[in-house]
Swiss-Prot record:
One of its GO terms (biological process) is translation. Belongs to the bacterial ribosomal protein bL25 family. CTC subfamily. GO terms for molecular function: 5S rRNA binding; structural constituent of ribosome. NCBIfam families: bL25_bact_ctc, PRK05618.1-4. Part of the 50S ribosomal subunit; part of the 5S rRNA/L5/L18/L25 subcomplex. Contacts the 5S rRNA. Binds to the 5S rRNA independently of L5 and L18. GO terms for cellular component: cytosolic large ribosomal subunit. SUPFAM superfamilies: Ribosomal protein L25-like. This is one of the proteins that binds to the 5S RNA in the ribosome where it forms part of the central protuberance. This is Large ribosomal subunit protein bL25. Coiled coil: none annotated. Keywords: Ribonucleoprotein, Ribosomal protein, RNA-binding, rRNA-binding. InterPro entries: Rbsml_bL25/Gln-tRNA_synth_N, Ribosomal_bL25/Gln-tRNA_synth, Ribosomal_bL25_b-dom, Ribosomal_bL25_C, Ribosomal_bL25_long, Ribosomal_L25_dom, Ribosomal_uL5_bac-type.
């Protein structure tokens, strides 16, 4: 996803309030844990993109930020929502550097849920863990990890170790954790 970002002034409340009233989202771009720039993103463009994303996919989505003539690859590290309207009111981006590893949550997607043996026998499929915390280089980031539940029977479980993890991705979450279970109704 490509976003055009503009530089903004300081963190004064009055300035940030005006940015939001004009249809912008204040954001901070970090690099190596240090603040690189205060920027503004068009709220309509970001919200339109956000509405097309699958639940949980924002954590592993790589953005290309056009900032002052540079193309910066970044991940959303933090997102803040308005309490009542649930509008996005602030974003934090972390710049991705090719040779530096990054920690992130990659969503787990269950596949073949319709063909699951346990569900066909009247069971209920329950996904216990929805993300896997991993460490990888920016080039190895994947949008999601797949867990095939087709052969899962009644009262059976699949663990994180049952997920085929692509090369270059190192899990931080213990692999003996239960990811999916089929329970009797």
């Amino acid at each position: 996803m490509e976003l055009v970002v503009q530089s903004r002034e300081t963190d004064k409340k009055s300035v940030i309030k005006k940015i939001r009233q004009q249809g912008g989202i204040p954001a901070v771009l970090y690099s190596g844990g240090k603040s690189l720039a205060n920027v503004v993103i068009d709220a309509r463009v970001f919200n339109k993109f956000l509405s097309t994303l699958e639940s949980g996919a924002l954590a592993s989505t790589v953005f290309t930020l056009s900032y002052e003539g540079r193309e910066i690859k970044a991940l959303v590290k933090d997102i803040q929502y308005h309490v009542t309207t649930y509008d996005v009111i602030h974003l934090d981006f972390e710049e991705l550097v090719e040779d530096r590893e990054v920690r992130l949550n990659i969503p787990i997607r269950c596949i073949n849920t319709v063909d699951c043996v346990g569900v066909k026998l009247g069971g209920s499929l329950r996904q216990v863990i929805r993300y896997m915390r991993v460490v990888c280089k920016p080039k190895d980031i994947v949008p999601f990890l797949e867990l095939d539940v087709q052969s899962l029977g009644l009262s059976q479980t699949l663990k994180l170790s049952d997920i085929r993890i692509p090369e270059g991705i190192k899990p931080v979450t213990p692999l003996k954790e239960v990811a999916v279970t089929v329970a009797r109704r």
